[in-house]
């Protein structure tokens, strides 16, 4: 190019070449603007879910988001991540909470109802005892406090507060509530009992009642399964002043003597001499005496001197036999 031409045309032809047209034309710009508007709608929907349109956010995404040459990246709305343990997350509301409510709440209500019913029937039982002549308030309170249904088989629990002797296995029975209250009242005679011996633990019910009247209760059972059962029955009550022994009740417990009171829950032809000797001066022994097939009488024996006892024959009763040895 000559100097004159250069002055007239300062730019060369190659300088006038335009850059290649970018893919974004007017249509692309319009699409980008539309995408931005959609993003604003999505952001507004996320910020105010209660007022959001029922249209799913995915339907607001640009149709050509993945097309080549769009040039403007469009952020897709964030989706909630699935739980890491979907099985647990799905089952938790149904099996964890609902089943828990079904198993826990009714059981608590049922336990409360049973406890309330037990207390009410015990009170009615105590009223019957009072009407039949039991007057010692300590004995009545003890009979009211000890749950007799815990000492019988579940199938007999409905009869626990009836005035009836019930079988406890091994040809043994739990004495009638009226007999238990009568024997304990006779043994106490209004005194403060320090040490009491029971012959024939059985299921442990009478020992539990005695534990609320005396400071220390010693109880002997000759039938090993009943001895073990009594321990299990007494364990939930957490009675601290009962000492159970497996042995021959006719021998007594010389090591723990003398006793303020002795209660024998089985009938013999007479009262064993060993037990009379273990009774403290001024102490009282209550026992059924008589033949198994004949008449049995509830007998009170009082020790009035080292070698003198006074006997009183009271009520007709019926008990299982008093036997020697252990099984």
From Swiss-Prot:
Its EC number is 2.1.1.77. It is an enzyme of class 2 (transferase). GO terms for molecular function: protein-L-isoaspartate (D-aspartate) O-methyltransferase activity. GO terms for cellular component: cytoplasm. SUPFAM superfamilies: S-adenosyl-L-methionine-dependent methyltransferases. Residues 1-38, 62-105 are annotated as: Disordered. It catalyses: [protein]-L-isoaspartate + S-adenosyl-L-methionine = [protein]-L-isoaspartate alpha-methyl ester + S-adenosyl-L-homocysteine. Residues 14-29 have a biased composition (Basic and acidic residues). It comes from the Bacteria. PROSITE patterns: PCMT. InterPro entries: PCMT, SAM-dependent_MTases_sf. Keywords: Cytoplasm, Methyltransferase, S-adenosyl-L-methionine, Transferase. The active site is at 175. The keyword Protein biosynthesis does not apply. Residues 92-105 have a biased composition (Polar residues). GO terms for biological process: methylation; protein modification process; protein repair. Residues 62-77 have a biased composition (Low complexity). Belongs to the methyltransferase superfamily. L-isoaspartyl/D-aspartyl protein methyltransferase family. PANTHER family: PROTEIN-L-ISOASPARTATE O-METHYLTRANSFERASE, PROTEIN-L-ISOASPARTATE(D-ASPARTATE) O-METHYLTRANSFERASE. Catalyzes the methyl esterification of L-isoaspartyl residues in peptides and proteins that result from spontaneous decomposition of normal L-aspartyl and L-asparaginyl residues. It plays a role in the repair and/or degradation of damaged proteins. This is Protein-L-isoaspartate O-methyltransferase. It comes from Burkholderia thailandensis (strain ATCC 700388 / DSM 13276 / CCUG 48851 / CIP 106301 / E264).
């Amino acid at each position: 190019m000559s100097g004159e031409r250069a002055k007239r045309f300062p730019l060369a032809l190659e300088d006038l070449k335009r850059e290649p047209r970018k893919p974004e034309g007017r249509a692309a710009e319009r699409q980008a603007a539309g995408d931005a508007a959609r993003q604003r709608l999505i952001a507004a929907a996320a910020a105010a879910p209660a007022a959001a349109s029922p249209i799913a956010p995915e339907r607001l995404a640009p149709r050509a988001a993945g097309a080549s040459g769009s040039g403007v990246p469009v952020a897709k709305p964030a989706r909630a991540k699935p739980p890491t343990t979907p099985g647990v997350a799905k089952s938790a509301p149904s099996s964890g909470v609902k089943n828990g409510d079904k198993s826990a709440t009714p059981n608590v209500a049922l336990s409360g109802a049973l406890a309330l019913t037990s207390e009410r029937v015990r009170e009615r039982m105590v009223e019957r005892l009072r009407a039949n002549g039991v007057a010692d308030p300590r004995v009545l309170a003890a009979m009211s406090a000890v749950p007799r249904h815990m000492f019988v088989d579940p199938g007999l629990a409905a009869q626990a507060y009836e005035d009836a002797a019930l079988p406890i296995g091994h040809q043994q029975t739990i004495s009638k509530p009226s007999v238990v209250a009568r024997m304990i009242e006779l043994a106490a005679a209004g005194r403060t009992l320090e040490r009491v011996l029971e012959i024939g633990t059985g299921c442990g019910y009478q020992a539990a009642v005695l534990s609320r009247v005396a400071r220390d209760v010693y109880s002997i059972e000759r039938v090993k399964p009943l001895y073990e059962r009594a321990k299990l029955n007494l364990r939930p009550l957490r009675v601290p002043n009962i000492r159970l022994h497996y042995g021959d009740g006719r021998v007594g417990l010389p090591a723990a003597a003398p006793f303020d009171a002795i209660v024998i829950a089985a009938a013999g032809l007479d009262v064993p001499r060993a037990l009379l000797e273990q009774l403290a001066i001024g102490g009282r022994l209550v026992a059924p005496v008589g033949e198994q097939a004949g008449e049995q009488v509830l007998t009170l024996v009082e020790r009035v001197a080292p070698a003198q006892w006074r006997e009183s024959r009271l009520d007709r009763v019926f008990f299982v036999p008093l036997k020697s040895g252990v099984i």
